[in-house]
């Protein structure tokens, strides 16, 4: 019910009362202050409002209306539960994929600090002492950049806007490109990697993406692909030059036009999206989605709620379908506390 007029027909998450217009999420704290027989106005906390004096049986009272206490930022009532799995597959001799899972959820003085998580998959290219080195190096540089530039400042209370977080995440991917490109020049080989990274802060996710690893979101509305493949076939499909199913079968499906380490500079796709309890995030390499396909991923998400069990089952299905490439996957469940 509305704190001001008592109306009970407001929407659960409504900001204002439909009857009187009071701010539902900002109920003032009102208390009665007795000051004795003197009508002199007492001192009150900054921002508080004081009524005219009220007299009753020789005593003087004031009503003190104080601003509402600061509430927790949206998303502080969430927790992140992650599962992950990487597998060589049934054809390749070497696993050139790397994955990263970092979660942070401290609590200070009974108040929850930012809920933070960094989840990434990198699919290396270049063969022995090439692809596996590139994917590992990219995630090492990205994680250091995010920890120094995002996690530590957030824990110190230096909260950045969503756009600032995304820019820092993209800068981390750019730094990874710099490192891999430099290593490639020194080694004189053609190593490189794709990279998809998801940063979660409270009820928001920031996504940075280069290549054809993918990020998905699963919830009651189904499976949503959050990334666009930087591949020749994906571009052909977008331009109407190939059928959607050719993403799995076209002779040039493995050719990507954007990767980490290929050039001195790289364009990093980015976006910010809301999160809610019940959402599940999936980050995976093409060795998973090419073998299982979107329909198969959705089927497993329906069957298995536990993130680790879902990862294990999806890797099993990818291998049963042929296991033609390395298989890496991270699944993050966004749950209510």
Segment roles from a protein language model:
Residues 1-337:
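PP2C/PPM-type serine/threonine phosphatase catalytic domain
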């Amino acid at each position: 019910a509305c704190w001001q007029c008592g109306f009970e027909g407001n929407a659960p998450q409504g900001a204002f009362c439909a009857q009187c217009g009071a701010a539902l999420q900002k109920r003032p704290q009102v208390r009665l202050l007795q000051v004795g027989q003197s009508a002199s106005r007492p001192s009150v906390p900054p921002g508080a409002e004081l009524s005219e004096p009220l007299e009753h049986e020789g005593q003087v009272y004031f009503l003190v209306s104080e601003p509402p206490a600061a509430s927790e930022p949206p998303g502080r009532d969430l927790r992140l539960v992650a599962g992950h799995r990487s597998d060589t597959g049934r054809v390749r001799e070497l696993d050139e994929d790397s994955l990263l899972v970092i979660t942070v959820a401290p609590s200070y003085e009974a108040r929850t600090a930012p809920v933070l998580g960094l989840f990434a998959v990198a699919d290396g290219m270049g063969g022995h002492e090439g692809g596996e080195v590139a994917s590992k190096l990219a995630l090492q540089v990205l994680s250091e950049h995010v920890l120094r530039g995002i996690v530590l400042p957030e824990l110190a209370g230096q909260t950045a806007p969503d756009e600032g977080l995304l820019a820092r995440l993209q800068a981390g991917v750019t730094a990874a490109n710099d490192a891999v490109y430099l290593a490639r020049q020194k080694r004189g080989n053609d190593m490189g990697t794709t990279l998809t990274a998801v940063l979660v802060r409270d009820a928001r996710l920031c996504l940075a993406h280069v290549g054809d690893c993918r990020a998905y979101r699963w919830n009651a509305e189904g499976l949503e692909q959050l990334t666009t493949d930087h591949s020749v076939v994906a571009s052909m499909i977008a331009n109407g030059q190939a059928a959607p199913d050719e993403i799995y079968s076209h002779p040039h499906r493995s050719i990507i036009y954007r990767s980490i380490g290929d050039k001195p500079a790289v364009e990093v796709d980015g976006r910010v999206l809301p999160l809610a309890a019940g959402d599940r995030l999936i980050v995976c390499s093409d060795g998973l989605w090419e073998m299982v396909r979107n329909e198969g991923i959705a089927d497993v998400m329906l069957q298995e709620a536990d993130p680790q069990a879902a990862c294990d089952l999806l890797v099993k299905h990818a291998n049963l379908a042929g296991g033609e490439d390395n298989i890496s996957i991270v699944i993050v469940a966004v749950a209510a506390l």
